[in-house]
């Protein structure tokens, strides 16, 4: 979807991503090679992004350029900026909110000619069709195609473009939706939390706009759970919620509307409760197959990485649901900001073999069930496994062999012991810290020693397979940071 940005904006976004991700010096020539453009273009882009993002501090020197005050929150601001300043995305959003308007009104809104509008819509459709099954029509002005894809695309778009606390939907206030969701939480065992609540509100309000313009999803009766719909329609308090919908939205909360709002969660392959899922494992051959595939996969991972799976059935339930909500919950696929993919990559940087095995087996699971097994879906399912497995990170870290650390000082033995004790307290328990006790010291003796890391306040020549930390005054704060960082570099090598 990044091709909906102009070439210049696309390049500037990639430029900022490079500077954010690597947090190091880049020469313009290197950036030009990475971005496949001229050094002049890089120079112009740097000038533009410095002006567009005054809160970011760019540091230039003979070493090149870098951003020196970045943190993980700043990058989100970058994506919001490119969404906001993209004509293509802005026109898409305008049409979503104003279906049925005249094409001339779009031209007036964006100060473009009729021919320019048709050219832009043609470009939008060309890019969208590479990934989604829908298109924009100007005769009349509407968005048509696969309704599931349309609803997912725009819900994901709103989640990426707007900040977490923003609510950009003028036609639908959030209160009646919150009332409806709270009723669902009360009447079912659906897990309620802040992020899930916001995700559902975004999905439901997107569905409401589509319903308002007369677009409904086709419901396969064979895969639809009528009992869930009937249960909700008979829930205590539904009348009050229906009145709020009628008065604030001018929409009747009848069975058809409720079905359209929750169609993803009323499908038979989605289980709102773990106990219902476990009962169905014994009755439905497809669910049984899904369960046993995941069970075998989890057992293999548990044995290979010596992880005790405390919540195996609960984890299988979550994985099964996730696999059957393709393009029906946020972050399955991204528009510009691959936030979930970045999360997986960060975890993979620490545990590369583990994540590689997870992805391989989950891809096999999806393919066997003949559901979507795209790389983004595999990432999405891998995220569910990693975050929903109890104490996963703790278990993986505890199973790592401890790093042996030698501390030496040219002051005296007491100084070395003081540093070792301090580091032992502040660093993780994945280190064994010792001081040098022999009377003599040589490079050869250090080469033959069992230590992985050597800390000293005097210079030691480079030693193969040893990580050396030289600190003239042994700055404890810096050492704590360096030592913990080295632990993560070592993991799963």
Swiss-Prot record:
<dbReference type="Pfam" id="PF08280">
    <property type="entry name" value="HTH_Mga"/>
</dbReference>
<dbReference type="InterPro" id="IPR013236">
    <property type="entry name" value="Mga_PRD_dom"/>
</dbReference>
<dbReference type="InterPro" id="IPR036388">
    <property type="entry name" value="WH-like_DNA-bd_sf"/>
</dbReference>
<dbReference type="InterPro" id="IPR007737">
    <property type="entry name" value="Mga_HTH"/>
</dbReference>
<dbReference type="Pfam" id="PF05043">
    <property type="entry name" value="Mga"/>
</dbReference>
<dbReference type="InterPro" id="IPR013199">
    <property type="entry name" value="HTH_Mga_DNA-bd_dom"/>
</dbReference>
<protein>
    <recommendedName>
        <fullName>Putative trans-acting regulator SP_1800</fullName>
    </recommendedName>
</protein>
<keyword id="KW-0804">Transcription</keyword>
<keyword id="KW-0805">Transcription regulation</keyword>
<dbReference type="Pfam" id="PF08270">
    <property type="entry name" value="PRD_Mga"/>
</dbReference>
<comment type="similarity">
    <text>Belongs to the AtxA/AcpA family.</text>
</comment>
<dbReference type="InterPro" id="IPR050661">
    <property type="entry name" value="BglG_antiterminators"/>
</dbReference>
């Amino acid at each position: 979807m990044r091709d909906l940005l102009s070439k210049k904006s696309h390049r500037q976004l990639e430029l900022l991503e490079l500077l954010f991700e690597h947090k190091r010096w880049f020469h313009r020539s290197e950036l030009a090679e990475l971005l496949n453009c001229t050094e002049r273009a890089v120079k112009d882009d740097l000038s533009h992004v410095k002006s567009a993002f005054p809160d970011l501090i760019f540091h230039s020197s003979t070493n090149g350029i870098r951003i020196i005050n970045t943190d993980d929150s700043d990058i989100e601001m970058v994506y919001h900026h490119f969404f906001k300043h993209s004509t293509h995305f802005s026109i898409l959003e305008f049409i979503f909110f104003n279906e049925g308007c005249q094409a001339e009104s779009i031209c007036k809104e964006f100060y473009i000619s009729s021919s320019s509008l048709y050219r832009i819509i043609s470009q939008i459709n060309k890019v969208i069709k590479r990934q989604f099954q829908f298109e924009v029509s100007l005769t009349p002005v509407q968005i048509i195609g696969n309704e599931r894809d349309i609803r997912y695309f725009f819900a994901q778009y709103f989640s990426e473009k707007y900040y977490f606390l923003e609510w950009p939907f003028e036609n639908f206030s959030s209160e009646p939706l919150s009332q409806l969701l709270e009723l669902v939480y009360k009447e079912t065992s659906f897990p309620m939390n802040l992020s899930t609540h916001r995700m559902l509100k975004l999905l439901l309000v997107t569905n409401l706009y589509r319903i308002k313009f007369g677009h409904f999803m086709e419901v396969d009766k064979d895969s639809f759970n009528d009992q869930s719909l009937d249960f909700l329609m008979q829930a205590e308090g539904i009348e009050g919620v229906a009145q709020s919908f009628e008065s604030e939205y001018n929409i009747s909360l009848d069975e058809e509307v409720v079905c359209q709002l929750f169609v993803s969660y009323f499908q038979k392959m989605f289980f709102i409760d773990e106990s219902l899922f476990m009962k169905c494992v014994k009755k439905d051959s497809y669910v049984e197959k899904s369960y046993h595939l995941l069970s075998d996969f989890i057992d293999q991972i548990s044995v290979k990485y010596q992880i005790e799976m405390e919540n195996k059935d609960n984890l299988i339930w979550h994985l099964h649901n996730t696999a059957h909500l393709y393009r029906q919950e946020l972050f399955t696929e991204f528009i510009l900001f691959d936030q979930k993919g970045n999360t997986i990559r960060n975890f993979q940087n620490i545990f590369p073999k583990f994540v590689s095995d997870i992805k391989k087996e989950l891809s096999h699971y999806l393919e066997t069930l003949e559901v979507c097994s795209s790389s983004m879906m595999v990432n999405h399912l891998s995220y569910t496994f990693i975050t929903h497995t109890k104490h996963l990170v703790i278990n993986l870290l505890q199973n790592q062999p401890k790093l042996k650390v030698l501390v030496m000082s040219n002051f005296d033995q007491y100084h070395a012991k003081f540093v070792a004790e301090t580091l032992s307290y502040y660093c993780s328990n994945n280190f064994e810290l010792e001081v040098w006790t022999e009377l003599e010291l040589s490079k050869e003796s250090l080469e033959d020693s069992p230590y992985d890391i050597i800390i000293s306040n005097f210079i030691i020549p480079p030693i193969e397979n040893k990580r050396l930390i030289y600190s003239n005054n042994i700055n404890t704060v810096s050492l704590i940071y360096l030592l913990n960082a080295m632990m993560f570099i070592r993991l799963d090598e």
